[in-house]
């Protein structure tokens, strides 16, 4: 798919994940509302499909969240704990910003940015 167009939802997906950069007037947001499709924010999806059943380790603060989250994920990996993570930057040790591990931990950055146009609460409130 290239760009935001209502035709992108013509196949009626089971769930639409809406990013925080999408505005209410976005053609796909309007279409999913008119079609009555199920939707959620990225933090809600991560909590439901990735973090569910895992212990969430949230790193917050003014500076250094990406670095600290990356170090924490690497320590857990090196300890043999096979962590999952979703981090704002690309981790050099993993060559990715996300990983779906089988271990008991999910590492995520906790920032104060809003979740989506339909949820102005901070993203970190979706992880408990």
Give the residues covered by each predicted segment:
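Phosphate-binding loop of NTP-binding sites
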Residues: 7-13, 20-128
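Long, basic/Gly/Ser/Thr-rich N-terminal segments
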Residues: 1-2
């Amino acid at each position: 798919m290239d760009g935001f167009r209502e035709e992108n939802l013509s196949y009626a997906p089971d769930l639409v994940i809406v990013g925080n950069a999408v505005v209410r007037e976005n053609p796909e947001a309007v279409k999913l509302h008119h079609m009555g499709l199920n939707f959620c924010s990225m933090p809600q999806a991560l909590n439901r499909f990735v973090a569910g059943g895992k212990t969430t380790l949230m790193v917050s603060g003014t500076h250094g969240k990406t670095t600290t989250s990356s170090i924490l994920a690497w320590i857990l990996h090196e300890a043999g704990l096979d962590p999952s993570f979703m981090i704002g930057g690309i981790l050099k040790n993993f060559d990715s910003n996300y990983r779906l591990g089988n271990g008991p931990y999910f590492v995520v950055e906790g920032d104060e940015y809003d979740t989506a146009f339909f949820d102005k609460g901070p993203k970190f409130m979706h992880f408990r």
